Amino acid sequence: MNAVTTSGKTQRVRNELSAPMRELSKFLEYNEWDSDFIHFGEGKAYLDTMELEKFGKVRPYDPNSSEEHTRTFPTPRSTGVAIYVFNTLPPLKRERVLLAFKNLCLDSWFIAVRCDPIAGTPHEDGVTTSRGTFQKSYSEKEALAEFGGKVIKKTRGYILLGVDK
């Protein structure tokens, strides 16, 4: 059996904001959010980072990045944002990364995970895709049980959760 990749192979270059970031931006604007953010697992979502900058200072972090400044582990920030990060990690790694993420978030966090069907070969609690990457699709109940918080938006493709400590 081939090894499952949980690295940058899942990153996407986007020409527009990700769907969860569009919704999060509306939420932050409505609530007049002003914060110091960590964009956890930024990947190639530079437009998402630029959108967060409308609401405060942003420190991108991604251990798989080709840019040195985004690979360096950050100091804690008021608010953490992780979009499509945790659904790419198998259970043990996901647990460790979630703990690290929540420890970096002093006041609040927002997490978006996939909830659409994902084709692949069953592997642990998700699937191995044809690209050799791990992906997990969450039900609303699973997402709330694993991450906590409250549902900000649920669509056919993603669930956006948030918590204000």
What is each PLM-predicted segment?
Residues 80-84:
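A conserved beta-strand element that flanks and buttresses the S-adenosyl-L-methionine
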Residues 88-100:
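A short, conserved alpha-helix within the catalytic core of class I
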Residues 76-78:
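Short acidic/histidine-rich motifs immediately flanking catalytic phosphotransfer sites
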